[in-house]
Amino acid sequence: MIALPPQPDLDLASLVRTIPDFPRPGIQFRDITTLIGDAVGFAESVRRLSACAAAYRPDLIVAVEARGFLFGAAMATAMGLGVVPVRKAGKLPGVTIGVDYELEYGTDRLELHEGAVLPGHRVVLVDDLLATGGTILATAALMRSVGAEVAAALFVIDLPDLGGSARLGAAGLRCETLIAFNGD
């Protein structure tokens, strides 16, 4: 295994590709595949997220489908912790527990394996991007429903103009991000 040295001066935002008008006109899609495709950039992202997470002393990393899995699994490995995937309904085999949450037009459901997170576990939630905050708030509600303590939610990218970070703060959920893309 090759351990890449820390790159504290690396501009992670420069490694995120912006695709205009995707998936529809007027949207600036922030594509992390260019960040994770760069070994140094991905390693530095994981190092920074892990350092943030370590300050909260979690028992587990909880990773949100789907790109949160990439960062959550790497962080958990770096920190010597387990990682628990939270998935959309019907994606996990076996007995699951879940929470329904509101979308702009309808509802969705998130699930995890029963017993994967236990009462008293201190967890850090991880996803790649924070937009409106709905998915991470639902994930936090799911964790609390099993008696876990949600220490914080961590993201690679925040789109503050969409209100997610403010919404999380208003809900009392600590939030940290590595990159913020304002406007455009």
From Swiss-Prot:
Q: What keywords are assigned to this protein?
A: Cytoplasm, Glycosyltransferase, Purine salvage, Transferase
State if Hydrolase is listed as a keyword. no
Q: Does the keyword Glycosyltransferase apply?
A: yes
Q: Source organism's superkingdom?
A: Bacteria
> What is the top EC class of this enzyme, as a single word?
transferase
Location in the cell: Cytoplasm
**Cross-referenced InterPro entries, in alphabetical order?**
Ade_phspho_trans, PRibTrfase_dom, PRTase-like, UPRTase/APRTase
GO terms (molecular function) for this protein are: adenine binding; adenine phosphoribosyltransferase activity; AMP binding
Q: Which reaction does it catalyse?
A: AMP + diphosphate = 5-phospho-alpha-D-ribose 1-diphosphate + adenine
Q: Which pathway is this protein engaged in?
A: Purine metabolism; AMP biosynthesis via salvage pathway; AMP from adenine: step 1/1
The record's EC number reads: 2.4.2.7
UniProt function note: Catalyzes a salvage reaction resulting in the formation of AMP, that is energically less costly than de novo synthesis.
Family to which this protein belongs: Belongs to the purine/pyrimidine phosphoribosyltransferase family.
| UniProt xrefs under NCBIfam families | apt, PRK02304.1-3, PRK02304.1-5
Protein name in UniProt: Adenine phosphoribosyltransferase
As recorded in Swiss-Prot or TrEMBL, the protein's gene is named apt
